[in-house]
Structures are given as structure tokens and as C-alpha cells.
């Protein structure tokens, strides 16, 4: 479909000397270096992706400010999903200050790294999420399968919150686990209005990933979320631990090949425009 916006709804930039990326260690050699707009621009040009959503990779307000500065000087970055201390007494003030920047489109606590799986259900977090909703921001849920039942409980209390589940909730593809994830994903789709990102799956599938290994997971997401609630993202540069940018994009397009053009266009860009108000 000519003229349709193609959006990568999940990519990162970082600069190691900032010092706030605790998860990014030398053993992750392919991505243990700085990544910026100059690294991604040729990949976007090669693949015909016109714009991106830049997502936080450190649980600090300072990193979010850094990303907003990058967005201000990078034409292809249409929005930023940042971080704020949603359980802090001053959360509303922090969110209000960050939201003054027009590029801020959402916030993402790094739920997968928080030791207490019930953290998201704490009353101060609920108040923080009401602030997110009040400022018209999306909430990115970086969760694993074990978080999905709590996430369903959380969203029942926040029916108006625009929620995007990152990386298909990280199914354990390499281990061949499907059943519990599939049941909880179905419940999430049926009980909430959440969107889910078609991203990060090659990382979860391991070094011997293939389109066919991903297919049952993608088909399950499509069956229950449908093309109106599925959003493409690259998870670049993390994806390069398993596949190149163009390689993952081609795999995603292969997995979506059975859909009509309008449905593919929604997944490959229009849904991101809607949920992040790009």
C-alpha cells in the first residue's frame, strides 16, 4: 500500500559511558558498544522503514532525558518511550516534567527486572499509572510469561490505560514452552484492550531460530489479538544477537504474508501511530 507509514515501534540507542545500563555487560559483545542514529539510519533506508519509536533501556530519568534530546535532532524518531519512578511520591511531578517534551509518547518500568512480581499491583504504582493515563501516555509492559496473570489484574483496574506488551511477553521459545504462555496471552487479549509487540522473538528463540519455530507463537498472537492490536518492532540493536535488522523484518513479513494488505499495514506501522499518537 503506497504511502502507508512504516514504523519500527521498538528500537534503542545507548552510550556506554552514561553508566546506567546495568544489564549491558561485556559478555554481550555484539551490542556492548555505543549505538546511535547514524548506525540505524542506513538500515531504515535499506528496508523502507520511515520512522521509529525509541525505547528506554535504563531505569533512570537521566536516560529518558538523553533519549528526548536525541529525538529532538533525529528526524526519523517519531516518539520516545521513557522511564519514570511510578511508585515514587513525586511520580506525578516527574511525569509532568518529562511530558513537557512533545516526543514523549509512553513510559516503561522494567518489570522483568523487578524482583517482586507483585510490584505492579502496589497502590503507589496504581497511582503512578493514573498519572500516565492523565497525560495521555502509553504504558509499555516489559514482562515475561510469569507476569501475565498479574498484568491482567492490573489492567482490570485501569481500563482506560493504553497498554503495549513488549516482545509478545517473551515466550520461552528456545525451551519449547507454549501452553501457559498461550493460555495467559489469550486471557489478556480477551479481558483487556492491550496491544502486543511483534518484537524480540528471535532473541527468545535462541541461536538456531527459524521462521517455522516462531510461527506457532506469531499465529497465536494473531488469532487472539488480531491485526488491529499487533505492532511490529525490531528491538534493534538487541536483535543483532540473533539476526540482522533486515533479516528479522523479512521474517516478520513472511509470517504475516497470509494477511491482506490493510492488515499488514496496520501491524507494520498504523497501529504504532494509533497507540503512541505519533
Show which residues each predicted segment covers.
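Active-site metal-binding loops of divalent metal-dependent hydrolases
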Residues: 11, 57, 168, 235-236
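Active-site phosphate/pyrophosphate- and oxyanion-stabilizing loops and adjacent acidic/basic residues
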Residues: 41, 65-69, 96, 152-153, ...
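Short, small-residue-enriched loops and turns at beta-alpha junctions
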Residues: 59-60, 86-89, 114-118, 171-174, ...
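Short, electropositive alpha-helical surface patch
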Residues: 62-77, 159-165, 217-223, 248-255
